[in-house]
């Protein structure tokens, strides 16, 4: 039985709205197609693009008005064997101030044998006073390949607005076959950014399968940044973390890393999404 406090929080959560987007990618005649999709609420997807032939480029659209108290968004992505999807967003995910209930975004990615996912979203912006829960889970079957980044922006640095109160619970889980993978949780509350060294921006870039040679390729780029950054290998999973005070600088850093990692991991030249040029 739920406690009184839990019942009150549940009632508050019910005051928000729900959205669910489910996408399934399949390979047909050597080309990846959006085989099926379902949506409920304002989570949408634009028509696929094919700027490089076989891989399918898709833009995921979050609610234009942002994510507010009690909202619950779920994104489910499934890649069938041999498929290759590149997903990005035309804009940031904005979590606004909440006086009570938590806004929740849950993202699940399942990658079948031999499939390839590039998950390259814009940043998630948490306004001062936001109460947010963000969970991203990736499951890779044998032979699957992954390039994925996630950017957390606490406050609005460009407007000199600090994340001086509020709470964030962020989970990043990557499951690899026969390996430990990654299970990382970050909790921030009350505007205390000591875990980030006072930096309002944190980016995590994950790539698999990687090896020592790939690690050595990215380290010189990180050394040039002039701000805290590091890279490590967890089995065949490369994990890169970067702290910053400037969102545009951080986005450029992630794109530079992607230009290096895409040929190294996927054996393909970089083909940036058109939205990056706007």
Curated annotation (Swiss-Prot):
Localization: Cytoplasm
Protein name: Urease accessory protein UreD
A GO cellular-component term linked to this record: cytoplasm
Function field: Required for maturation of urease via the functional incorporation of the urease nickel metallocenter.
Family: Belongs to the UreD family.
SUBUNIT field: UreD, UreF and UreG form a complex that acts as a GTP-hydrolysis-dependent molecular chaperone, activating the urease apoprotein by helping to assemble the nickel containing metallocenter of UreC. The UreE protein probably delivers the nickel.
Domain of life: Bacteria
């Amino acid at each position: 039985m739920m406690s009184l406090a839990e019942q009150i929080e549940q009632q508050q959560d019910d005051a928000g709205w729900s959205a669910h987007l489910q996408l399934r990618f399949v390979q047909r005649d050597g080309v990846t197609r959006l085989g099926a999709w379902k949506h409920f609420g304002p989570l949408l997807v634009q028509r696929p693009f094919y700027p490089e032939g076989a891989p399918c480029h898709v833009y995921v659209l979050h609610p234009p008005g942002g994510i507010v108290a009690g909202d619950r968004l779920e994104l489910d992505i499934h890649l069938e064997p041999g498929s290759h999807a590149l997903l990005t967003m035309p804009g940031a995910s904005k979590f606004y101030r909440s006086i009570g209930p938590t806004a929740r975004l849950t993202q699940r990615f399942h990658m079948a044998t031999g499939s390839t996912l590039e998950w390259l979203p814009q940043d998630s912006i948490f306004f001062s006073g936001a109460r947010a829960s963000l969970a991203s889970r990736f499951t890779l079957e044998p032979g699957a390949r992954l390039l994925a980044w996630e950017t957390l922006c606490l406050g609005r640095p460009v407007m000199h607005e600090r994340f001086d109160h509020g709470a964030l619970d962020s989970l990043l889980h990557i499951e690899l076959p026969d390996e430990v993978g990654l299970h990382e949780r970050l909790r921030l509350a009350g505007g205390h950014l000591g875990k980030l060294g006072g930096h309002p921006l944190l980016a995590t870039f994950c790539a698999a399968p990687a090896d020592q040679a790939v690690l050595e390729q990215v380290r010189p780029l990180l050394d040039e940044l002039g701000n805290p950054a590091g890279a490590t290998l967890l089995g065949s999973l490369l994990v890169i973390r970067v702290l910053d005070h400037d969102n545009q600088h951080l986005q450029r850093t992630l794109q530079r890393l992607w230009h290096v990692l895409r040929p190294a991991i996927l054996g393909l030249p970089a083909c940036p999404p058109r939205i990056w040029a706007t």
